[in-house]
Design a protein with these regions (language model features):
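Non-transmembrane amphipathic alpha-helical segments
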Residues: 18, 99-104
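Short, non-ligating residues that shape and space the ligands of small metal-coordination modules
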Residues: 108-111, 126-127
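Cys/His-coordinated zinc-binding microdomains
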Residues: 103-106, 121-124
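Processing junctions and N-termini across compartments
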Residues: 96, 111-114
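Extended, Lys/Arg-rich, non-catalytic nucleic-acid recognition/anchoring regions
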Residues: 1-96, 120, 127-232
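The −1 position to Zn-ligating cysteines in a subset of zinc-ribbon hairpins
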Residues: 98-101, 116-119
Length: 232
């Protein structure tokens, strides 16, 4: 038993050392992202939270564990509820700021050429978060969001539109991460964005953009991500 414990301890230590090397390599800016995308974690809840760190650290792991007990392990129900929570958190506690990677320009210079910023999609905007996102109880957050929804949440062409689009995008990514158990790339690379479009009759509609890696989620994950977007 002692030998096994030492073996596990050595595995963790070696993994930490490898991650340090990888982070140093990524920091040089020769890759699309400046940090290692694959996080280390212990269980589904922890994996999902680490996977969603790009949405800003929050209490997702504890929420998943609580909801898993509440819904008797029904992962689809948990995914939908987590999507609602993350969407509400991003809308209520989020604020529009300049993208940290490009400084708000929407472009990244690499040597003699310029490319669209990967992090913000060329918009120059990103989302910052207030401290409440890490301390507010999720039930209180959902109640507050329900009150907010009694009046229009966004206006076309306004900052509230970008905030709402980003909040829905965050919710879809979070729900998909739970569905795929936090082990697939689909929530990171498969969901590109969410946007409000205008129909011919002037009514708004929601468009979710996907990329090739969404295929790793399988048909159920892909279909449920659209359902989650509709619910949000």
């Amino acid at each position: 038993m002692v030998a096994y414990a030492e073996y596990i301890k050595r595995l963790h230590a070696d993994a930490d050392a490898i991650y340090e090397i990888a982070e140093e390599a990524r920091s040089k800016g020769h890759d699309p992202r400046m940090s290692v995308e694959i996080p280390k974690a212990n269980d589904l809840a922890d994996r999902t939270q680490k996977l969603l760190d790009f949405l800003h650290p929050r209490q997702t792991a504890d929420q998943i564990r609580e909801l898993t007990k509440e819904y008797d392990g029904n992962r689809e129900r948990v995914a939908i509820e987590i999507a609602k929570i993350v969407c509400a958190e991003s809308y209520l506690y989020g604020e529009i700021v300049d993208c940290a990677d490009c400084g708000g320009s929407g472009e990244i210079k690499k040597g003699n050429w310029v490319s669209e910023c990967y992090s913000c999609g060329g918009s120059g905007n990103s989302m910052g978060f207030k401290d409440e996102i890490g301390i507010s109880a999720w039930r209180d957050t959902l109640s507050l969001f329900a009150e907010k929804k009694k009046s229009p949440l966004w206006k076309l062409g306004d900052d509230t539109q970008f905030l709402s689009e980003l909040a829905i995008y965050h919710g879809v990514c979070a729900g998909l991460a739970v569905l795929t158990e936090g082990i697939l790339v689909a929530p990171l690379e498969g969901v590109v964005s969410s946007r409000f479009l205008t129909n011919e009759d002037g009514s708004p509609s929601l468009a979710i953009s996907f990329a090739g890696p969404i295929r790793s989620a399988g048909g159920t994950g892909q279909a449920l991500s659209v359902l989650i977007a509709d619910i949000l």
